[in-house]
Amino acid sequence: MASTRPSSTATKTKAPDDLVAPVVKKPHIYYGSLEEKERERLAKGESGLLGKEGLKAGIEAGNINITSGEVFEIEEHISERQAEVLAEFERRKRARQINVSTDDSEVKACLRALGEPITLFGEGPAERRERLRNILSVVGTDALKKTKKDDEKSKKSKEEYQQTWYHEGPHSLKVARLWIANYSLPRAMKRLEEARLHKEIPETTRTSQMQELHKSLRSLNNFCSQIGDDRPISYCHFSPNSKMLATACWSGLCKLWSVPDCNLLHTLRGHNTNVGAIVFHPKSTVSLDQKDVNLASCAADGSVKLWSLDSDEPVADIEGHTVRVARVTWHPSGRFLGTTCYDRSWRLWDLEAQEEILHQEGHSMGVYDIAFHQDGSLAGTGGLDAFGRVWDLRTGRCIMFLEGHLKEIYGINFSPNGYHIATGSGDNTCKVWDLRQRRCVYTIPAHQNLVTGVKFEPIHGNFLLTGAYDNTAKIWTHPGWSPLKTLAGHEGKVMGLDISSDGQLIATCSYDRTFKLWMAE
């Protein structure tokens, strides 16, 4: 068969104009050394053809390229992108292998443990579950296990922190506890016997007596008003015989006034700053000599001073407090003195032994007020941490935790019936607690501002007195806790209050620098 291969002459046939390819001039390739050419070029440059001016002209013409030295490695950039793509691919692969709970609450808990928002706007359970899966694919499932272990460790540390621990007290503390036990048990028996006798009184007689008392309380009026100092009066307290009233002032002075005519008897000088409280000894003006210690006071600088009735100077100073002492209270026996301090503790002092026998901690913030049970067996404290505590002085244990107030507790008091406790707080309420049931039995919405003090009627506890920063004091029935009378008359905050031992007089002191006596008509 004949070959159809075209001859060489066929390539020389003339093609159409539109198919003619442009002729490309091939560059010349030179072989060998360029030394001679370079010498010629340099020789011409020395003659001025390519000198500095020629170099400058070449740069301006763009024939000579001057670079900054920056180099962009294309291969390195491509490798980084490839690494990112591979990492994302591996992450998605891990995400598909991670098992996530279908319980939405558990998914939220896991997100919270990882420090992520538990929900986003418009996010449903499925999207939330997928978001958790993506987070775990980045941080790893071990992160969730680690957070759970940390939570368990923190719980264990909290449990260890909440364990009871003890201070080793002095031998005098043991002696004092035995003494308090021997003192309180007979008084408790006497109180219970009086309660039995009171219960034997016919119901009609008791009801009529209560009605007469309520009628008398409703007729209370301002009997006397006296300007007590140039600065606000922070505290007032009746003497046991109800013939004197002690007031504490922000000027650092303590004053004694006659009752009921309100004449100034003594001015006690010794404090250099705001006095927080001054209280009479339980046996002062009754069986105690005037030269003995009849009063105790405390101030914001941590000083606690003891006073007699025949001198304007303090008899002794109780040293040991380094920060503010808010309140001071006598034990019913008169042998011990309790102080509350802003160092989150309260202390018990034995004045016969002249030493501190108990430094009790337990509050997480400063302790503001303290009260003793009339038997002498218990102490109640109210703190700025919004909690109250009841302590058994015979064993040192906290027997009741008063939890329920929303703000600081500024006042606490025991009822003469032996089982009711009242607390006043910065949340404007007064709560009544039952020692037998160990719970709050009633919450009184007492005032429109913080409650500064609470006080039970000292004989039978038939009514409750409260004072507050709304410039009023109020009287409440016991046990009904209904309002009986509002004592309005102060132009400033009511900062302190007290009821005389015979129950006939009520005293209130105020930020307006006055104290007032209230008596039934």
Swiss-Prot record:
SMART domains: SFM, WD40. The modification N6-acetyllysine is found at K26. WD repeats lie at residues 229-268, 271-318, 321-360, 363-402, 405-444, 447-487, 490-521. Keywords: Acetylation, mRNA processing, mRNA splicing, Nucleus, Repeat, Spliceosome, WD repeat. InterPro entries: G-protein_beta_WD-40_rep, PRP4-like, PRP4-like_sf, WD40/YVTN_repeat-like_dom_sf, WD40_repeat_CS, WD40_repeat_dom_sf, WD40_rpt. GO terms for cellular component: nuclear speck; spliceosomal complex; spliceosomal snRNP complex; U4/U6 snRNP; U4/U6 x U5 tri-snRNP complex. One of its GO terms (molecular function) is U6 snRNA binding. The gene is PRPF4. Plays a role in pre-mRNA splicing as component of the U4/U6-U5 tri-snRNP complex that is involved in spliceosome assembly, and as component of the precatalytic spliceosome (spliceosome B complex). Transmembrane segments: none annotated. It comes from Bos taurus. This is U4/U6 small nuclear ribonucleoprotein Prp4. PANTHER family: U4_U6 SMALL NUCLEAR RIBONUCLEOPROTEIN PRP4, WD40 REPEAT PROTEIN. Component of the precatalytic spliceosome (spliceosome B complex). Component of the U4/U6-U5 tri-snRNP complex, a building block of the precatalytic spliceosome (spliceosome B complex). The U4/U6-U5 tri-snRNP complex is composed of the U4, U6 and U5 snRNAs and at least PRPF3, PRPF4, PRPF6, PRPF8, PRPF31, SNRNP200, TXNL4A, SNRNP40, SNRPB, SNRPD1, SNRPD2, SNRPD3, SNRPE, SNRPF, SNRPG, DDX23, CD2BP2, PPIH, SNU13, EFTUD2, SART1 and USP39, plus LSM2, LSM3, LSM4, LSM5, LSM6, LSM7 and LSM8. Interacts directly with PRPF18, PPIH and PRPF3.
